[in-house]
From Swiss-Prot:
It comes from Synechocystis sp. (strain ATCC 27184 / PCC 6803 / Kazusa). Disulfide bonds: none annotated. Its EC number is 2.7.1.25. Keywords: ATP-binding, Kinase, Nucleotide-binding, Phosphoprotein, Transferase. This is Probable adenylyl-sulfate kinase. It catalyses: adenosine 5'-phosphosulfate + ATP = 3'-phosphoadenylyl sulfate + ADP + H(+).
Amino acid sequence: MQQRGVTIWLTGLSGAGKTTITHALEKKLRDSGYRLEVLDGDVVRTNLTKGLGFSKEDRDTNIRRIGFVSHLLTRNGVIVLVSAISPYAAIRQEVKHTIGDFLEVFVNAPLAVCEERDVKGLYAKARSGEIKGFTGIDDPYEPPTNPDVECRTDLEELDESVGKIWQKLVDLKYIEG
């Protein structure tokens, strides 16, 4: 099967549902015979970007590195699923420009919903001051103004979110319907 490479970049607050959507989309794509790789922000931080902190500069470096790897894979015909908070709009635009074949997916859920879903207790630690610079609490998240797809995970089921991304990939001829 001939396939075009594309990076599908899922951005949103911690707990919004990026990883859940990524895994469901990964399964659907693999079951359909597509070659793909998943770059999860948490996994990347323990390997490729180990040693980086959470300053704006380090976060930008982290996203640039994920973008570089995504670009290499995309230009070689691989579908890349990136699941990363990527809180700053400017760096998301930079990697979009670098990669070219790029879909921005805004995984959108209200902060209160993300806090309710927080099994690691990170939001509570951020609110108590135990964690500093936590996105959405004391560090900004700049939502995309014009994403290719928006998934409202507080209002729609997982299958609907995956279906919206799938349909966009079909519409843009990255995959067959």
